């Protein structure tokens, strides 16, 4: 997507490194503490990759990202929960805006929620994103809920999310 001149924005708690050390999007130079965003350094890149560690306020950050996705529909805007169950802190945003805004106000939004879930050694509460709650909110094609099984699935899901001609929230 970056090589096709699309912008990508990711925010959430510890997203630069990834809670499970799965991303390493920002590297620090040991001597100078300079931060290097590798995805903005590769040749042929046209778009901008912005990644921001956020404060521990899911409600505020998801609200900001929802507004950002609304104001900048040409940017793939992603909010990642540090653990899947952390979406609880933003439940009002999910209920009132993410799942219902198109029906209520006839506005579309393409915000992507990444909700890590699985047994990562952090205990039962952190191990479930409670996807069943998102499935219960699905009605009249108001959002997409997906559980990818391969990296290729994930790539094509994000690509489709950004390249289609309408916007709908995506929960992964």
Regions found by a protein language model. Give the residues of each.
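Phosphate/diphosphate-binding loops
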Residues: 76, 81-172
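Non-catalytic terminal/interface segments that mediate subunit docking, oligomerization
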Residues: 1-74, 81-102
């Amino acid at each position: 997507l970056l090589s096709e001149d699309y912008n990508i924005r990711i925010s959430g708690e510890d997203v630069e490194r990834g809670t499970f050390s799965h991303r390493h999007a920002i590297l620090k130079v040991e001597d100078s503490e300079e931060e290097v965003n590798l995805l903005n350094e590769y040749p042929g890149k046209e778009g901008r990759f912005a990644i921001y560690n956020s404060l521990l306020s899911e409600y505020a950050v998801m609200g900001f990202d929802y507004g950002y996705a609304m104001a900048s529909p040409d940017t793939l805007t992603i909010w990642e929960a540090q653990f899947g169950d952390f979406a609880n802190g933003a439940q009002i945003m999910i209920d009132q805006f993410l799942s219902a805004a198109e029906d209520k106000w006839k506005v579309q939004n393409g915000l992507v929620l990444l909700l890590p879930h699985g047994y990562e050694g952090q205990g039962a509460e952190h191990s479930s994103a409670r996807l069943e709650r998102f499935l219960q909110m699905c009605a009249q094609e108001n959002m997409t809920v997906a559980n990818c099984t391969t990296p290729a699935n994930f790539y094509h899901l994000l690509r489709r999310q950004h390249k289609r001609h309408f916007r709908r929230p995506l929960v992964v």
